[in-house]
Design a protein with these regions (language model features):
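Rossmann-like NAD(P) dinucleotide-binding subdomain of oxidoreductase/dehydrogenase enzymes
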Residues: 1-114
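ALDH superfamily catalytic-core signature
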Residues: 37-38, 78-221
Length: 221
């Protein structure tokens, strides 16, 4: 998200200041180091791309600063409302990419193998923490059972563990707050009459000491 927004701005001759999520600062530093090398090789002034690490207070400061004509923000809907209000209050511009509820529609003539591969990767890749993570499947009734059974079998084969181990499919959630949200979501499914067809749960024991490794679950509504 940072790359495609800033690249357009740079091409148009603008300077960019980036504040990554306080939960993933190393990713921001790595990206900044890469672009710094590219700029140096092409004699672009160092300050054209700047990085500021910090918590939400840094974001608030940037939203209110009239020297920043356009603020691009990616995150939750709650965050987006705050940014939009602050930037609009100084007649600035905002570009928001906010949380959603992404779905895959599965029609009767869908390729079952590709459907399962795409759905599983979309749902469990990066432990379901991408803004583009698959959260729902809308399946035609004529193939519903076939797709459901295939997904259940696929989930049984998932390996959960250290993401630095390439044999694992699913890594940890970002922190214990995310684990709480995960548990609350599963509880809400049951409370609202849904059916859990692939059981979730927090993993414990050797390799799972952080308490942030969870089992991907599937709910039927």
């Amino acid at each position: 998200v940072w790359a495609w927004n800033t690249a357009l701005a740079w091409v148009c001759g603008d300077v960019c200041v980036w504040k990554p999520s306080e939960k993933t600062p190393l990713c921001g530093i790595a990206c900044q180091n890469i672009i710094a090398e590219v700029f140096k090789e092409n004699n672009v002034p160092e300050g054209v791309s700047c990085l500021i690490n910090g918590d939400y207070k840094v974001g608030e400061f940037m939203s209110k600063d009239s020297r920043i004509p356009l603020v691009s923000a990616t995150g939750s809907t709650r965050m987006g409302k705050i940014v939009a209000s602050e930037v609009a209050g100084r007649l600035g511009k905002s570009l928001l990419e906010l949380g959603g509820n992404n779905a895959i529609i599965v029609s009767p003539d869908s390729d079952l193998k590709m459907t399962v591969i795409g759905s599983v990767f979309g749902a469990v890749g990066t432990a379901g923490q991408r803004c583009t993570s698959t959260r729902r499947l809308i399946i035609h009734e004529t193939i519903y059972d076939k797709v459901k059974n295939a997904l259940v079998e696929a989930y049984k084969q998932l390996k959960i563990g250290n993401p630095l181990d390439e044999s694992n499919h699913v890594g940890p959630l970002i922190d214990t707050l995310a684990v709480d949200s995960y548990n609350n979501a599963l509880n809400k499914v049951v409370e609202e009459g849904g059916k859990i067809i692939v059981e979730g749960g927090v993993l414990s024991g050797n390799g799972y000491e952080s308490g942030c490794y969870v089992k991907p679950a599937i709910a039927e509504a």
